[in-house]
Regions:
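Positively charged n-region of N-terminal signal peptides that target proteins for export
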Residues: 1-8
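Hydrophobic core
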Residues: 9, 13-17
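Short helix/turn-capping signatures at newly exposed starts of structured segments
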Residues: 18-42, 79-86
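Soluble non-cytosolic domains of exported or imported proteins
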Residues: 23-24, 76-83, 166, 170, ...
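Short secondary-structure junctions
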Residues: 34-50, 96-109
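Amphipathic N-proximal alpha-helical interface segments
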Residues: 45-79, 111-138
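Long, charged/polar, surface-exposed segments that mediate recognition or autoinhibition
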Residues: 64-107
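Mature, structured domains enriched in cysteine- and short glycine motifs
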Residues: 136-191
Length: 191
């Protein structure tokens, strides 16, 4: 019985340390995508926010925390997601093949939890996006308009944003943007 307890305790400790690590380190993510694209990553307004445009019309935004991917937004023209989006999601290493198939079937403007990750599918007038973060971090994420606008939001559909990017509160502070008067007036944050 003691041996079984010790084995279970060790397994729980390993799982706990794996969860504490969060998603993939950014350097590993960049390497995972380097076989797919020669395009270079660029910073976008803050040192914790990086952007890649692997093909025309597709933007991959990565928000970092402690050198790891904290949130990913893959934005593309409305309709079926191009291969570059699927490569970006797969390279995270947190979603298995079955989860990626479920994401492909997600309804517009919906969210789900898969493999310990919170996944959202956003639909705008001209742009769609998939957003991914660790499930336990989803309530701490904010939303930033990608095309125009300069306010931070609690909701991805607030103020008619065509495409919203998921970011951490730390990145939001670094950007220095003002809070939206509609959805952040209460001071409550969340995805």
């Amino acid at each position: 019985m003691r041996r079984l307890f010790a084995v279970l305790l060790a397994a729980l400790m390993l799982c706990g340390s794996a969860l504490a690590e969060g998603m993939i380190p950014f350097d590993d993510y960049v390497k995972a995508l380097s076989d797919f694209t020669d395009e270079l990553w660029s910073q976008d307004g803050a040192e914790l926010l990086w952007v890649l445009e692997p093909e025309e019309g597709v933007t991959i935004s990565v928000c970092l925390e402690d050198g790891r991917v904290a949130a990913l937004t893959a934005e593309f023209p409305c309709g079926d997601a191009p291969d570059a989006v699927w490569m970006a999601l797969d390279a995270l290493g947190v979603l298995d093949g079955e989860a990626l198939e479920q994401i492909a079937e997600m309804a517009e403007d919906s969210e789900t939890e898969l493999d310990g990750s919170r996944v959202l599918r956003l639909h705008g007038g001209q742009r769609d996006a998939f957003c991914v973060c660790a499930a336990e971090d989803a309530g701490n994420m904010l939303w930033q308009p990608i095309h125009g606008g300069s306010k931070l939001h609690d909701k991805p559909a607030c103020s008619g944003m065509d495409a919203a990017r998921m970011i951490t509160e730390e990145t939001a502070e670094a950007l220095g943007w003002e809070d939206c008067e509609k959805c952040r007036a209460s001071g409550k944050s969340g995805a």
